[in-house]
Structure formats: C-alpha cells, structure tokens
Amino acid sequence: MSSSEPPPRYEPPVEPVNGIVQPPVIPPAERPGRNTNQLQYLIKTVMKVIWKHHFSWPFQQPVDAKKLNLPDYHKIIKQPMDMGTIKKRLENNYYWSAKETIQDFNTMFNNCYVYNKPGEDVVVMAQTLEKVFLQKIESMPKEELELEPVTAKGGKKKQRAPATPKSSSGGAGASTGSGTSSAAVTSGPGSGSTKVSVAASSAQQSGLQGATGAGGGSSSTPGTQPGSGAGGAIAARPVSAMGGTVSSTAGGAPSIPPISTMPPHTVPGSTNTTTTAMAGGVGGPGAAGANPNAAALMASLLNAGQTGAYPGAPGQTAVNSSSLLDGSTAAVAAAAAAAAAAAAAAGGAAGAAGGAGTIPAVAVNAANAVQAYVNAGVSVGVDAVIPPQQPAKIKKGVKRKADTTTPTANAFESPYTQMDSKSAKIATRRESNRQDLTFQGSGYNMSPLGVSGVPGLGGLVAGGVAGVAVAKNKEKLSDALKSCNEILKELFSKKHSGYAWPFYKPVDAEMLGLHDYHDIIKKPMDLGTVKRKMDNREYKSAPEFAADVRLIFTNCYKYNPPDHDVVAMGRKLQDVFEMRYANIPDEPVANAAHHHGHGHGHGHGHGHGHGHGHGHGHGHGYGGSSSLKHDASDSSSEDSSDTENESNSDEERSARLKMLESKLLGLQEEIRKLSEEASAKKKAKKKLKEKKKSIGGGSGSGSASHHCHATGGGANAGGAGGPGSGGHGSVSVPGGVGSLGPGGAGGANLNALLGGSLVGHGGAAVAGGVPNVGALHSQVHDVAMAFSQMAGGGAAAGAGFGAGVTAAGASSGGKAGTLAGALAAGAAAGAGGTTAGSGSSKGAKSKGGRGAKGSGAGGVGASNNAAAGNAAGGAAGAAAGAGSVGGVGGAGAAGGGNASKRAKGSSSAGAGGGVGGANASAGGAGARGSSKKKPSQVMNFDSEEEDTAKPMSYDEKRQLSLDINKLPGDKLGRVVHIIQNREPSLRDSNPDEIEIDFETLKPSTLRELESYVASCLRKKTHKKPSGKSKDEQMAEKKQELEKRLQDVTGQLGASKKTAKKDESASSKVEAVQPANPVSSSSSSSDSSSSSSSDSSSSDSSDSEAGDGDERPPRKKKSRDSNGSNVNNPSINVVMGGNLPSGALSPTTMLMGLDHVVNSNTPTSQMSNMLGNANPLTAAAMLNNNNKTSLPGSNFGGAPAPGNMMHAGAGVPVAGAAVSASTGQQHNKNGPNDLSKVQPGGPINAALPPHSFAGGTATVATSQSSGGIRIASNLHKPSGLGGGDLGEHHAALAAALTSGINSTGTAGGGINNNGGSNNNANPLGGSHGDAMVNASLASLASGLKQIPQFDDPVEQSLASLEFSAGSTGKSGLTDNFLMQQHLMQPAGPQQQQQQQQQQPFGHQQQQQQQQQQQQQQQQHMDYVTELLSKGAENVGGMNGNHLLNFNLDMAAAYQQKHPQQQQQQAHNNGFNVADFGMAGFDGLNMTAASFLDLEPSLQQQQMQQMQLQQQHHQQQQQQTHQQQQQHQQQHHQQQQQQQLTQQQLQQQQQQQQQQQHLQQQQHQQQHHQAANKLLIIPKPIESMMPSPPDKQQLQQHQKVLPPQQSPSDMKLHPNAAAAAAVASAQAKLVQTFKANEQNLKNASSWSSLASANSPQSHTSSSSSSSKAKPAMDSFQQFRNKAKERDRLKLLEAAEKEKKNQKEAAEKEQQRKHHKSSSSSLTSAAVAQAAAIAAATAAAAVTLGAAAAAALASSASNPSGGSSSGGAGSTSQQAITGDRDRDRDRERERERSGSGGGQSGNGNNSSNSANSNGPGSAGSGGSGGGGGSGPASAGGPNSGGGGTANSNSGGGGGGGGPALLNAGSNSNSGVGSGGAASSNSNSSVGGIVGSGGPGSNSQGSSGGGGGGPASGGGMGSGAIDYGQQVAVLTQVAANAQAQHVAAAVAAQAILAASPLGAMESGRKSVHDAQPQISRVEDIKASPGGQGQSSPAQQSPQDRAAAKRAEQRRAEQERRRREALAGQIDMNMQSDLMAAFEETL
C-alpha cells in the first residue's frame, strides 16, 4: 500500500499575483508524482483532445481576475484550476494517480459552474468540455499501473494510489469513487494490516470503511474497490478522497476530496469494484473482523464517520440523511464501533464467514454492518451523499451535467457529482447497477453497505454481491419510473439548466455560508441525489421519486425567502416537473400505483400525519411493487423524516404540501390504478409472475408502509421513510423491518434485521454491536421515532433484539430510519448478511440462485430497503435474508421483480455465510428479477438483459439499422430513449443530435431496439423485422423469467404447480421453496407472496386497519375472521360470558377494544390485557379478534392506561414511545396495520425501549388477535365460542405471552428496557416480546395460512402463489385473501408454508427431527431459508413480518422443517406446521434472528434444539420419558444431545413421523386444527369437503393461530405474540397433535387435552390417525414414513416414557391435564421456554449470549434444562449442559433478568416437565425468578412459568409466578400459568395457586395455572383465564415445542381458552367451565371445554367440523358482506391477486 498510498495531497492556497493564481506544477519532494498508464492516457489522449477542442480556450490558462475585471473571483473560487496547469502537472509527473488529475479537471469545471451563472457561454463551454472529458475518461484503462519512471511525464501522483489500481479501474472517477463503504469494509481482504494504518489516516474519512478494510481491501483487489472505493479511496487518499467528503474538513483540497468521496461511492457501483468487492469482500469482512482492531477500527471508522460530517452521517446513515449529524453521529459511530467491537468479540470466536475468519463473520458483519452503515451513511448518510452512491463507476461519461450544473457543490458532493455523478449516472446505469443495488440497498438505508458490511456473513458475498450485485442489480424501471427517469433527464437538460442548476447538487451549506441550513432543512435533497437514487433503483414507484423531487422544492421554499431568485427558479422548475410528472404513463404508474396505488389510497388514508401513509398503503396494493413503489411511503417516509426533523412551521407547510401532493399522487394513482386495473389484470398475470417475484418486494413495501404506520405518523413516515425512504429507509422495513421492521416487516424486519439480524448475524457479536448501533441510532434519531419505528420494525427484530431492534427502530424513524434502514439493511445483511448485500448486489443476482433467494429478500430487502422499505423485505428479507428465510423474506423484499430472481438464490443461502452469500445472490437475483420485471424498462436493462441478451450478428445489426431508418420520425424518439437509457455513455447526449454506432451498443440495447423496431414495423407494415418480434421476445423473456422464477422460487409458472411443491417437499429447503412458495419459493415467489402478503398484509393491515384510516376494515377482517366474533360486542359478550369475569362485559370489552384501538396502543392494550388480566381487557383483546381494539388496550399492558402497572415502569418510557407509535399506528392501521406497523413500530419500539414487553407483546398479540381471529373467523366464523375464544385467547395469549415472553423471555432485554414495564418481567419483555411476537406471528401466520388453504390443492396453490394462498379459501379467501393478499399474502403463504410445513412440522417435527440431521446440513439451508423466509416475512410480511420476521425465522426454522413441513403443508393447505412449529417460530424468531445471525451453527443448534425441544415436546407429549431422555441427553451432551437428540429426534421423528403420518392425515385435520391452535385436527378430506368450514373449524380450534393470522398480518408484534402463542399452542397441539387428530371441533380440545397426556398422545396419535387422503406426495411420503417413524418414535417414546414417566407421572398426578400438557410440554416447554427465553434473552442480550443460551437451551431441550442461562451466557450456548443451564438459570434467577431461563434451571430441577415449562417460563421471566420457585410448582407450574416466564413469575412455580405475577401477571401464566399471565397482581397468587389467584384477576389467572386451577381459571377470568389456562396448557405443550412461542403462548394460553382447553384436556372439568364459556362464545368446534374431545369420535369431530365449516361459511358470508366495506382497493388487489393466483 505504501507504494500505492500517496502522501496526503496538500496544496497550500496560492495568493493571486496580478489577479492570477498559478497553482504549483512541480511535485513537492515529500510527495513525488508517479507515472501511470492512466496518467499517460490522460496526457496523451484526454488532454490532447480537450486542449484542441474549440471550447477549451477559456480554460487553457489561469483566470486573470484583473484582466477580466472579476474582483470577487478569488474570493469565491478558493482553488483555481485551469487546463494549462493540469497539463503542466501531467508533464511534470505532479500527480500520483489519474484520480487527482480528474479531480483537478472537476475542480476546474466546478469553479466555472460555481462562479458563472448557468446558461452563460463559458458554462456551456465548460459543460461541453466536461462531456468530452468524461467520454474520454470512459475509455481510460481501468487498472492504474505504475509505469517505469522512464516517462517522467506520465507520472501523476495519485493520492489514492493504494486502491488506485482498482479504484482507478473504477474509472477516473471510479478509482476515486471506489469508496463503497461497504465494499471497502468487506473488501478488506488484504486490508487486515493495512487497514489499521489506513484506518488511522483514513479512519475518519473512510469512516468505518477505510479502517475495516477499505484501505487494505481496496488495494488488495479490484473487487475491494467497492469497499475500497470508500475505504480505499479514503484510505489511499484520505484527505482528498474521503476527507473532503467525509469531514469536508479533512483533506487538503476540498474540491478534490469531494470528488474522491463521490468516486469512492462510485467505485462500488463500478463493475470492477463489484467484482473485486466480492473477492475483497470475502477476505474483507474477515480481514476487518480478523483485525483485532476491527472493533477499534470500527470504532475509529465510526468515529471517523463521526468525525467526518459525512462519514458520521453515514454512520448514522439515516440520521445523516436527515442531517442528523449530531453528536449522535458520534454516538452512533461509537455505538457502531462498540457494536462492531462486540460483534468482533462475540463474533470473533464465532468464526467469520468472511475471509479473515479471524473474526467471526458475525463480528465482521457487525463491523461491516456498522461500517457499511457508516460508509453507507457516508455515501448515503447525507443527502448530499446521494451522488456518491450513484457514481458507482468511473464511467462518468455523460453524467457530468449534474455535477456541472451545480454551482454550489458540497465539497465532497461536487466532485462526486461531477465525477461521480457523471460516472455514476453513466456508470451507475451500467455498472452502477449492481452498485446501485448495493447502494440502493444502502441507498438511504445504507443497507447495501450494511449488507456489504454485514455480508460479513457472506462477507465476500455480501461484499462481492454488494459491489457486484450492486453493479448488476439494476432492476428494470417500471414504465412510470422510466417516465420519471425521462423527466429527470429532462430536468438535467440544457433546456432547463438555466433555472435548474441550483438543484443539481446538494446544497453546500459550508461553501455558501448557510450555517443554519441543516438546522432548517432536515432532509436535504437535490436532483443529483434523485438521479443517483434513480440510477440506483432506489425508487420503487413514481410517487417515491416525485416525493423526493418535491422535497427539493419544498426545502428550497422552506429555507429561502419567497422573493429569492432560487425560489423563483424552484417554482419554475417545479412547474416543469409537475407538468411532466402529470403525464407519466398510466401503466407504469399502475405498476407503481399498483404496488403503490393500491396501497396508495390506503396509504394516504393512513398517512399518519404526513400523508406518508401512502407508502404504506402501497404495500398492500400489490405487494410486490408496492413495496417497491413505496414512493409515497418513501416520500412519505422521507417527508415524515423531513417533517419530523424539519422545523415545524416550514415543516408543516412542506409536509402539508407534500401530503397534498402525495394525496394527489395517491388519487392519481388510484385513478390510474383503476383505469389500469383492467390492463393491469391482464398484465397482472404476467406481472404477477414477475411481480410475484417482485411482489415479495411489494409486500416488503407494504411492510414498509406498515412500518411507516407502525412508526406512527412521524415515525411512520420516518420509519417507513427510514427504511422506506431510501428506500423507505426503514422499511426500512426490512426487516424489514422498518424492514423488518419494518419498520414494518420491512422496517421491522430491517430493524429486526438490524437488531436481530445484525445481532443475529453477528450473533452475539453483532447483537452486541448492533444494539449499540441501535442505541446510537436511537440517539441519533429520535429515540421515540426509532422506537416507534423499532416497534414497527424492531418488533420482529425486537423479538430477538430489543437493542438491535431499537437501533433499527431508531434508524427506522426518520433519518434514523434511513440509517436504520441502512443498519437494518446492514442487519438484514448481517442477519441476511448478504441478504441485504444480495439485495444490493445484483451481482449475486440469480446466480445466488436459491441462496440468493434468501439474500434476495434481504438484498432486495436491502435494496428495497432503500427502495421500498422492503427493508422488511429487505430487512426482513435481509434479516430473513440472514438465513434462507432472509432469502425468502428477502425475496419478498426483493420481491418486486427481484423476488423471482432472488428466489433463485434461496437455495444458495445455505446457512450462515452461505446464507449471506446465497442471500446476497438471492438479493441480486431478486434485484435482477426486478429488472426482469420490466425487461424493456429503462435502466434496468443492464442488470438482467445485459446478462441474457444475445450478441447481435452483423447481419442483424445491419437489418436493425435499416429497420430504424424505416421508422417514422415520431418513433425515433423512443429509439433514442432506449439507447440513452441503456447506454451510459450516451445518456447525456442531446437526443436531437445523437450519434449512434451500433458496434458500441450493448447487446441488450440492440435487442431492445430490435424488439421495439419490430413492434413498430409490425404494426405499420405487418412485416416482422429480422429480429424476434417483441411478442416472441417477451414470450421468451417470460419463459426465461418463469424458468428462472421456477428455479428461484419454484413458485412461478411451473413452480406454481404442486409438483413443484412436492419437489420442494422432497427437496427440503429448496424443495420447500417450491413446494411452499412460502418457504423458498416463498423466498421469491413467496417473497413476492410474502411481499404480497406483506403488501397484502400491509394492505390488509392498512386496509384492514382501515387502510390506515379506519380500523374497522381491520376489525372487519378480524370480525370476518372471527365470524362469530363478527360482532365485537357479541364477541365481547361471548368473551365476557366465556370469561366469566364480568369485567369483560361486552361494553367494557368493546370499550376496551375501541379504547384500545383508539388508544392505538396495542401495546397498552396488550399491556392491559396482559397487565390487566382483567377479563374485560382480555376479553376485549379476545374480542379484538374482531376488532382490533383488542390488541391495543388489553394487551398493551404497558402502554394502556389500564395497564399502567406494566406500562408504569417501562411502558411510559419505551411503552410511551411504542404506545404512541402503536397507538397512532393502531388508530391508523388498526390492529392489522398495527400488527404490521405496530409489530414493526410499537413492538420494536416497545421492545427496545419498552420495557413493557407486555405492551409490545400485547400489540403483537392484539394484532395477532385480530389477525388470528381473522384467520380463525375466516375459517370458522361460528366456532368463536371455543375457537374464537381460543383465537382471541390465542391472541391474548400471544399478547400475554408476548408480554410475558417479552417480559420473561426477553427478560433481560426488557428488564433493561422495560424493567419498568413489567416490573420483574420487563426484562424479558422486549425480547420475549419479540420472540413471543415472533411466535405469535408464526402462529398468526399459521393461522392465516390455515384459513388460506382449505383444500390441499388450494394449499398447494397457495403455497405456490401467495395470492393463491390468500385465495385458498373462498370465504376465508375473500377476507383472508384481502387480508392475506393485502395484508399478508406472503405472510400467509410463508406461514402457510410454515404451517403447511408445520403440518409437516408436526409430523415434521418428527420429520424435522429426522431431518434434523439433514437439517443440520439443512440447517444452514434451512436457516438461510428461514432467514429467507424471515426476510420474506419481514419483507413480505413487513409489518406483519416483523414478527414474522422472527416468525419467519421461526418459519424459517419451520421451513427448515417446512420443507418437510411443506410437505405436510401440502397436507391440508393448513400449515399446521406453523403452529406445530410455533416453538420454532418463536425460537426461530429469536433464534432465527440471532441464530441466523450468529452462527449457522448456533442456529442449527438452536434449530436442532428447537427441533429437539419440539421433538421433546412431541416426545414429551408422546412420552415424558423421551423428554427425560432428552434431558439426560441434554445433560450428557447438549451439543451431542443435539446430535443425539437429532438421532433420538430422528427416531422420534420417525416415530413421530409415523405418528405424524398418522397425524398427518389427522394432521391434515390437525394442520387445520394446528393452524387453529392445532387443537382441532381435521381430516384432509373434511378440509377438502368443506374447506372453508373445516378450515374455519380448524381455525377455530386453532383459534390462536387464526387470531394471529390477522395480527400476523396486522400486528407483527402481536402476531409474534400470537405466533408465539400459536406456536406454543401448535406445539402443544403438536404435542397433542396425534390426539388432536381426534379432536375435531370442540372435542378436539379435549382430545388435545388427552393428547397432552403422553400415553394418549401416542395412542391417540395412532388411533386417531385416520387414513386421510394424502394431501400430496408429501403426505403419502409421510404415510410411508409414518410407520417407520412411528415405530421408531414409539420406541423412542417408550424409552422416553420410561424415563419421563416418573416425571410425567408426577406432573400428571399433579394435574393430569396440565401435567400431561404441561409436563409433556413442560419439559419440552421448559426446553422450549428455556430456548425461547434463551432466545429472547439472546435477543435481549443481543443474541450472542442469547444464541448461546438458545443453543444451550436447545441443547438442553430436555425439559428442564431450561437454558436458563443460555440466554444469559452464550458461552454455554450449545455446550452448556443442564448444569450449566441450571447455573445459568440460577444466574438468571439471581439476576432476575432470568434471561428468562433461570426459572428453567430451577424448574428443571423439578421434574423435567415441570422444570421444562417452569424453567422456560421462569427463564422467560428473567425473573424466572419465580421460575425457580415455579419449578417447585412442578411441571405445570413450570410450564406455566414458561408462559409466564416473561412475567418472571411465570414462574411457574407459583411462588415466583407470584412474584412475577405482581409484575406482569404473565408469570401467572407460569403457574396456571397462563391464567396469571394476564392478571397482573393475581399473578403471584395465580402462580402459586396454579391459577386460582391468577384466575381471579382477569388475569384469567391462570387459568388456573393448570387444570387444577382450571376452575379458578373459570373463575372470574375464566374466559380469559381459562383460555389462558388452556393456552397455558397448550402453551406448555407448545412450549416444549417452542419454548419461546410456548412461553408467550403459554402465558397467553393461560389467558386464553386454549390454555383452558389444554387444562381442560387435562382436567376436562376444569376446562369445561371454560369450555362451556368457550362453547358459549362459540359452540366451539374447537371448544376448549368439551370434556372429552379426545374421546370424540372422528365422526363427531367431523360433524363438529362441518358445523364449524357451516359457521365459517356463514361467517365468511358475513365477512364477505363486511368485505364489501373493505376498500375497493383491497378488493381490487384481492381480485388481482386472485386472478394471479388462479
């Protein structure tokens, strides 16, 4: 490097002599110049041509100010430059590198533009010269090689020598622009050592990059260039490269630095860079990580970032963007550094996927992510940065205009613009494509960078992908965006330059002396930035673009006085713009609008204060595009950021303006959409396929928008904006989240990604780091915003990582959102690692194939992130991307077109690094898909077509030339347009005098011309040109796309076929993808599905949520879902009735609901529910199914006033933020929206800040409730009684669980966060919440999915197409469709997949266990897939999939199983697996997030553990003995146990599989049942006969899941909670599954109860197993396997039974019901809980420890070992034995944080069962505390504890539970657990009493914690309590399966009928009161009570099912009637989706 690293270039200012300044031309001794090939080229070719140009004379000598009478010239122009000086310098070897020469040229031109007015002759001359210059530079050698000094002349010093060769390769600008920060980071392969030194000088400049690897990396490979670009450029020439840019203070030559700076960014875009980046990336992350200094570097880099205004900003990316470069930047940088350090530390050992390997990928990722952050931030951080991204390439060619035009150019910007802008613009188009993507991802999100950084995962992949992907990832622009691009080009044309020039470049406040500019203008924007974003495909819709353009004008009007010239110019330019914009094509808009428009209308409605809602709305619209199209969202997000950040008065003005504009846009779009609908529908099918690919994106979008919503108004915009903004920064979403969180799924996902993913990826390391980042971000961005966003985005992430989420959340909000987006992206990248990267990297492209898929989601997500807030998708995708799921999710995020391509990558996403790489690929693929989307779209050409276009022969060219000559004049414009769009070098050419040489055109351009000319001539002369006709081309393209899609998603086209499904089933993860589009396909297709789901989810949530403006729709949906619940009051009544507690009186409930809804504090609602334990609240919550109110008030224990207790502590703080966020969102979106948004926003917010995990959980729950209910209702409107209650309860339980889990599981996290919130529980709250949420989400997903498929075929279809999924059921389908499609198409699909998978999952749990071995292999794939899925969920479900992100992770896990599960899913279209895998879901969320993140290993371990636990649970359910064995095994060998368990599991799996096979048939029933809570098994046949009814029935039975479904769709957090509950239930159900099979309707409950008993489980399983029609080959396969598996399982069960019998008997004796449920699940639950707790704790702890804990608990699945400590200590992670676990638990207990696991240990001491649950529970509670005592309580209590765990009391053991109880009641759950869950105070008693106390309070107490308390449950809270008890029981069962989910679920279960049900099963009598109540509520096919459902004959069940179906039918009709109320948009979306699915 020394040779390539020039000394800093310092040119002291020269005083003018006689008006002339002659800069030095002789190189100083200390800085000799060099002679390089590039410099030779410059002097011999470039200078020669330019010097001879007839316009060069004014520039050939220094300006003589005296002679020209320019007295102020040297005051304005501080660094004069002229060609004469440059020429002399070239001749004297003054330059070190060509970059410096180019900088001088740019300085010269800029001086001209700055001093002279646009339009003046000299300016025109300069522009002409600059064009020539750039065109010449285009052909400059890419590699800068030092020549022998022989030619003394050629040498120029290139400051950036080190990376110079590469950077130079980037192009003149490229070399300078090599600074893609992420690339640099990733690229640091060789940078290891140099890094430090480079970092030293360049650290500040490069921000993170240089240090991390940019410096080294850059030199090391061209690839590193992208990384090196920023880093290298910075490092090499810190001052000029980054210095100027970064700190603008650094660097000797201000002008130069900017240029450098830009170029670095540019470089990333450059192809070279990309490629190199990859290579470099591989080593880079490692190198960075390897560097012990990595952390320091990161810190320094971050600090550097801080130091550098820009870098700092970048660090804060989002923040920066918003001009939030406050001290927070430093904080952020510090946090990032800390995170990096943490990551490094944590990750260090983990092992880097990246090259260095020294530092774990995680650490690297973390560092990278941070770096990416900072770097991205740097490049994107400031709005000014915009250009940097753009100039990915050196090809500055035609782009100079922007630069030229800006008289005021930021120091860094101007250069960038000039150099990069051009280059970027040009290059960007070409190479920047990939870069663009990366940048796109990172865009504002910085996601790409993040990805790149994160790519630590794929380190190289990410890096490479980021670079390459970026370069390659330009999607085709939609027609609307093409038109926008044309408008943009026009604005840059000479025609308008006279009044547009002030807007071409970022305002250089320093240079212009506008010191208050950034105080007033929080979100600077300029046309250069817009152009960069456009080139980088950061705009997913026209409104997004328009919003940015308008932002330029509003900023102008805001800052300048009205009479200022600039204002006049701005108005003039705006008139031009608005005129042009009004005429953009409908179709394109439709595309945008579609995506966008749909949501748009809603969006607007939602638009929280800022009208940013649109973005959200879009989401639904089409899902795919929506997210992409988040324009509105984007703009809104940006606006909101803007608004948020900008001063109020002006801000309000501009906000109003923007709002109106957006509304106008929205209306226009609606009109367009409607008018297009017809054509759109036609296209829909075509596009659907593509869109499916892209839909994922859409969904991401949706999520983004959701996220926005989640974010709340401001946060909303900000969040969405954050993720959404850069692409919706938050959506930044992704998850996504923003991303994932999404905000939203996107934002949350992103957040989740960020939080979880980053954390996850880095695992602990990242987690540690990320959280810091999160903190940073939070600080940077309003914490509130961040929180709200986080809540939205973080929810999913939050599950895993409060802090991380917070960061994400913070980032989500506003600028922070952007940063968050970036972070989220990063996180996603981290989680998805490459995911984000992939998204950003187009390079990964389809190559990524499957792997890419995951990443696609992530990547796309990332890109969406930037772009569509796909963050969810992106983040989610990214986060999901973290794993394959990420790919899926990512796919979803990428979802737009990307999804399809991206899908491909999914398989690749193997795991960990693979995932990263694959993800990145996927992302690339996704992006590519996007491109594909509009094959002939403008700039995207490069990405896809260029790769695929066939070179043209001479004859063809000649024919084409002749044909063009035949074209009429009016057709030639389009020809030029095509060429200019596709040929960067010609982009700036004047169309009227363009010269075209066919030999120089790219094949893709020629092919596009050919098809266009052919179409024109065909029409005209009907003669086909020689080339293929456009139709043929389109057909071929379509075929190829379909083929690719199939490859990628296995979803589209052929993939839609069930065959594909079968394949996928067989193919496991990959197969799963196809089979369950949700899974892999889900990745892409589902990603589209997901995105669609997201969007649909978003939509649904939006529309449902009233589309942001009315909750009713959502309510409707819920109601619809509920059917029975149709009437809130009635439900309330029912609820009330069921819940004996009078408190639940309908009025109260309603009030609560409405109140809650109104409060919009789902969290508060949840808290209330949770905290309140008042039946009323609970009832409301339950009711909320119908309504959304439920979610808000009841559950939001924290926020709700009622829940002040909980809220009191943490809530006020975090809760408040969340609450507000939630509330707003809630109002806006209603639970659904909330769920989406909230999950993202509130939950995350809640989680991180929260302390009231409960609240968050609640939110999730309530939303969950709504969602689930929806599903439930959909399925069985009339089944409300049991089912509904169950559902409500499930929701409640989920919420409670969420809260509890949050409290408990998250325990530690919440404690910190929400210590306040849940007293003892708070600690876990956040995490648990997230986890629970995730579980709930899973559940919800499952439920959603359940409703979706009635019919196996339908299911298959649904699997294949998310829309199909939504279509799965007619009645359900309608509402569901709307919900699903709008809200949660992807989610449902994913969930369907999950559930389908889960049905497999149950069987597959066994299978999973069998497959666990495979899965271990698969683990990576699965994880990847999970991640993919998660991402997808994140992206796809965006808001929904915040949770879903986690959920998806769970799903991903499931998807791991899912592959198997998918097979199962095939069974009924019900994805029982989802529930079955609830634990997995919950775990997956956390685990996935952080397992994903952390290590594939851990993930695998966790998965295994989860699987094991599930197995254990199943086994426990099947046989306590197994559990004991597992425990023993666990003891003996946690790790071995995993293997052993795997073996055992395999046996179990086989046994279970056999059972499952039996079950499967039943499970088909069960799947439905499982979906419904897995309580009611439905024969497939039944399902098939009356799909709706059956499904409804099942859903009823699976009420929880159904509740979740909507919530899934709506409240991610709630969904997560619901999912957790559902998953817990599912697990319970699974536990009972065999029995469940027998349980059809109400009897199913008792059957479940009996199933709970180990003996009955097995027997019932076998006995109940009826031969059901094989749903598909999967089932048949299962059937075959069943026998063997069952035998094996039986053997294993026998053994385990013996071992466990003692414990089981104790437990059984204790409370046969509870015992059996609990004990079976107890141990499993304990394990699950432990794992969940660990997971939550891990999440809380940032996943490192948590991951370990998870692993540990996973290892310890044996029921008792709760990994108590697992969460707390990662070390014990997998290896820790039970002792360790116990120690940990003790630690936890001691700490109270419990890591949630502590209880485990204690409990574990009790019987395995008892401790299992207890510990889990207690663990959750962190306090666990009671947990320990709980353990005394015995399995039941233990189990309860688990659920309670969050409560800390949970503690199962009554005692602790009590403790907790006080705190959150959750603990109550522990005991009766569940019951208490609700009750706050009672809790204690509850726990102790096992529920009675708990019962008593609405806490539902517990349901009596157990059966015993069943009566107690019945007592006041019966409704709630019993449900809770049932839930608890179920949860206990489920817990085993998914501890995390179970924990949450249990608490919730306790609170919900399910618990009672379960209890009832155990003690039918106890349950019966509940049952009767349930029956009251709904004659409950799944009625909990029915005494002996188990005994019910299949016929009875069938009858019940039929009745249920009938009810469902009625409900469906009712719902349909309601649906009428649902927005037409939704309907149209549904219709389109329907058609598409059809």
UniProtKB/Swiss-Prot annotation:
<feature type="compositionally biased region" description="Low complexity">
    <location>
        <begin position="1645"/>
        <end position="1665"/>
    </location>
</feature>
<feature type="compositionally biased region" description="Basic and acidic residues">
    <location>
        <begin position="1776"/>
        <end position="1791"/>
    </location>
</feature>
<feature type="compositionally biased region" description="Low complexity">
    <location>
        <begin position="1857"/>
        <end position="1884"/>
    </location>
</feature>
<feature type="compositionally biased region" description="Gly residues">
    <location>
        <begin position="1814"/>
        <end position="1828"/>
    </location>
</feature>
<feature type="transmembrane region" description="Helical">
    <location>
        <begin position="874"/>
        <end position="894"/>
    </location>
</feature>
<keyword id="KW-0217">Developmental protein</keyword>
<feature type="region of interest" description="Disordered">
    <location>
        <begin position="677"/>
        <end position="735"/>
    </location>
</feature>
<keyword id="KW-0597">Phosphoprotein</keyword>
<dbReference type="GO" id="GO:0004674">
    <property type="term" value="F:protein serine/threonine kinase activity"/>
</dbReference>
<feature type="modified residue" description="Phosphoserine">
    <location>
        <position position="1653"/>
    </location>
</feature>
<dbReference type="GO" id="GO:0048813">
    <property type="term" value="P:dendrite morphogenesis"/>
</dbReference>
<feature type="region of interest" description="Disordered">
    <location>
        <begin position="891"/>
        <end position="956"/>
    </location>
</feature>
<dbReference type="InterPro" id="IPR043509">
    <property type="entry name" value="Bromo_Brdt_II"/>
</dbReference>
<feature type="modified residue" description="Phosphoserine">
    <location>
        <position position="452"/>
    </location>
</feature>
<feature type="transmembrane region" description="Helical">
    <location>
        <begin position="1939"/>
        <end position="1959"/>
    </location>
</feature>
<dbReference type="GO" id="GO:0006338">
    <property type="term" value="P:chromatin remodeling"/>
</dbReference>
<keyword id="KW-0472">Membrane</keyword>
<feature type="compositionally biased region" description="Gly residues">
    <location>
        <begin position="711"/>
        <end position="735"/>
    </location>
</feature>
<feature type="compositionally biased region" description="Low complexity">
    <location>
        <begin position="1716"/>
        <end position="1728"/>
    </location>
</feature>
<dbReference type="GO" id="GO:0005634">
    <property type="term" value="C:nucleus"/>
</dbReference>
<feature type="domain" description="NET">
    <location>
        <begin position="942"/>
        <end position="1024"/>
    </location>
</feature>
<dbReference type="GO" id="GO:0106140">
    <property type="term" value="F:P-TEFb complex binding"/>
</dbReference>
<feature type="compositionally biased region" description="Low complexity">
    <location>
        <begin position="1079"/>
        <end position="1100"/>
    </location>
</feature>
<feature type="transmembrane region" description="Helical">
    <location>
        <begin position="330"/>
        <end position="350"/>
    </location>
</feature>
<dbReference type="GO" id="GO:0007362">
    <property type="term" value="P:terminal region determination"/>
</dbReference>
<feature type="region of interest" description="Disordered">
    <location>
        <begin position="832"/>
        <end position="858"/>
    </location>
</feature>
<dbReference type="InterPro" id="IPR038336">
    <property type="entry name" value="NET_sf"/>
</dbReference>
<feature type="compositionally biased region" description="Polar residues">
    <location>
        <begin position="1121"/>
        <end position="1131"/>
    </location>
</feature>
<keyword id="KW-1133">Transmembrane helix</keyword>
<dbReference type="GO" id="GO:0045944">
    <property type="term" value="P:positive regulation of transcription by RNA polymerase II"/>
</dbReference>
<feature type="compositionally biased region" description="Basic and acidic residues">
    <location>
        <begin position="1680"/>
        <end position="1708"/>
    </location>
</feature>
<dbReference type="InterPro" id="IPR031354">
    <property type="entry name" value="BRD4_CDT"/>
</dbReference>
<dbReference type="GO" id="GO:0006357">
    <property type="term" value="P:regulation of transcription by RNA polymerase II"/>
</dbReference>
<feature type="region of interest" description="Disordered">
    <location>
        <begin position="1384"/>
        <end position="1416"/>
    </location>
</feature>
<feature type="compositionally biased region" description="Gly residues">
    <location>
        <begin position="1885"/>
        <end position="1915"/>
    </location>
</feature>
<feature type="domain" description="Bromo 2">
    <location>
        <begin position="475"/>
        <end position="584"/>
    </location>
</feature>
<protein>
    <recommendedName>
        <fullName>Homeotic protein female sterile</fullName>
    </recommendedName>
</protein>
<dbReference type="GO" id="GO:0016020">
    <property type="term" value="C:membrane"/>
</dbReference>
<feature type="compositionally biased region" description="Low complexity">
    <location>
        <begin position="1745"/>
        <end position="1760"/>
    </location>
</feature>
<feature type="compositionally biased region" description="Basic and acidic residues">
    <location>
        <begin position="1028"/>
        <end position="1046"/>
    </location>
</feature>
<feature type="region of interest" description="Disordered">
    <location>
        <begin position="1016"/>
        <end position="1139"/>
    </location>
</feature>
<dbReference type="InterPro" id="IPR036427">
    <property type="entry name" value="Bromodomain-like_sf"/>
</dbReference>
